[in-house]
């Protein structure tokens, strides 16, 4: 028990969590997933309740009647069996109940995929902030080294005091930027941990420019999209509801058998009885016709929603695919600019150390590099978001 307690405490915090681990935890711990799983269990019991209307019903009764001393007390025992023989409404209701369970299973799949998308978004948001911290650390190291160089030159009387003050100011800015980046990273970790229902102290991963093979995106969307599957199932259930309403036109037939044993009877054999019942509603004021019409209208409404949703998702998919291509081209351009900015900073630093360039030139080159590297990270982050949207829509 002590070992188990220590093990559970150790699980409360997650260090260096990967994307795969985060996706696994999301599917296990997300509130929406757990609620959907409970709803499936509730619908399983609902099916049992509906199934009871087509199964035999057995009832028994025991009675004792005390009379005066001059009369004989009466003891009675009865048992009855009722078996539906033909009840189309009950069968159609059972189909609807089973369809509802299947619908909830599809909803669970849809919720799971949406949770995966949310995990990806929050994970890559945290990863972006972590990369910002790395950039801030590199920037801080650069200005620390620059300050040491300027202090040496100032002590030797080579550089004026304004250069020293400027170097200290840039170092202070770098420290402040690092603290801000660390705080944003911790906020991103807390947001991810809130979704995963756990404490996360760090994540592990890197931005990758993953390529996915795209065929007929409209076909893949219709075949694989979980949200469309949910809406398609709603149409099926609406059609089943139409059949259920139509089944109410038909009569019901049931058999009833009973046995009664009573001490008041002269012959116990008289206690058996059997009945065959036919129930039919002759006229209900066209209520059933109205119910069928309403059910048909619901089918039309669900069909319209399905077509609108399909068009909406297809438009979103095309936009996301277009974004992937555009961002990929932008990343290639930024990477080239990044190499150029690194070389420009190297040359400016060397020129400054040899007294050819000013510290302002170095400052401008460093700021340009920081801006380009941040732009590259943002582009990689946007690429992952668009990729997550595409995966959500067609996988």
Which residues fall in each region the model found?
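Periplasmic alpha-helical coiled-coil/stalk elements that build and connect Gram-negative outer-membrane
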Residues: 17, 112-223, 320-323, 327, ...
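Membrane-embedded beta-strand positions in outer-membrane beta-barrel channels/transporters
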Residues: 78-80, 123, 254, 275-277, ...
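Amphipathic alpha-helical coiled-coil segments
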Residues: 35-50, 111-138, 145-147, 151-152, ...
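Sec-dependent N-terminal signal peptides
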Residues: 3-12
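Outer-membrane beta-barrel domain signature
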Residues: 71-72, 146, 176-179, 183, ...
């Amino acid at each position: 028990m002590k070992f188990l307690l220590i093990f559970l405490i150790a699980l409360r915090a997650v260090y260096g969590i990967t994307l795969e681990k985060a996706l696994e935890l999301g599917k296990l711990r997300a509130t929406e997933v757990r609620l959907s799983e409970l709803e499936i269990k509730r619908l399983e019991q609902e099916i049992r309740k509906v199934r009871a209307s087509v199964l035999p019903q057995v009832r028994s009764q025991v009675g004792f009647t005390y009379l005066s001393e001059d009369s004989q007390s009466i003891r009675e025992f009865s048992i009855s069996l009722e078996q539906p023989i033909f009840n189309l409404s009950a069968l159609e209701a059972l189909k609807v109940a089973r369809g509802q369970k299947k619908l909830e299973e599809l909803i669970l799949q849809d919720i799971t995929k949406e949770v995966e998308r949310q995990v990806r978004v929050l994970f890559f948001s945290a990863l972006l902030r972590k990369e910002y911290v790395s950039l801030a650390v590199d920037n801080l190291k650069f200005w620390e080294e620059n300050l040491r160089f300027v202090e040496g030159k100032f002590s030797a009387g080579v550089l004026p005091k304004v250069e020293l003050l400027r170097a200290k100011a840039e170092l202070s800015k770098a420290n402040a930027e690092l603290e801000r980046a660390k705080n944003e990273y911790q906020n991103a970790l807390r947001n991810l941990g809130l979704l995963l229902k756990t404490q996360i102290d760090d994540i592990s991963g890197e931005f990758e420019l993953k390529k996915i093979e795209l065929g007929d995106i409209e076909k893949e969307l219709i075949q694989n999209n979980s949200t469309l599957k949910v809406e398609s199932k709603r149409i099926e259930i609406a059609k089943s509801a139409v059949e259920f309403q139509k089944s109410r036109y038909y009569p019901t037939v049931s058999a009833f058998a009973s046995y009664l044993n009573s001490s008041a009877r002269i012959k116990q054999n008289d206690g058996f009885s059997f009945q065959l019942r036919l129930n039919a509603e002759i006229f209900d004021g066209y209520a059933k016709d109205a119910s069928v019409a309403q059910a048909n209208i619901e089918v039309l409404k669900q069909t319209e929603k399905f077509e609108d949703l399909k068009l909406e998702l297809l438009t979103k998919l095309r936009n996301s695919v277009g974004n992937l291509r555009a961002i990929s081209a932008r990343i290639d351009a930024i990477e080239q600019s990044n190499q150029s900015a690194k070389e420009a900073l190297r040359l400016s630093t060397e020129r400054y150390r040899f007294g050819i360039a000013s510290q302002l030139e170095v400052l401008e080159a460093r700021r340009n590099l920081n801006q380009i590297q941040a732009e590259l990270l943002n582009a990689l982050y946007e690429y992952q978001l668009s990729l997550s949207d595409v995966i959500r829509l067609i996988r």
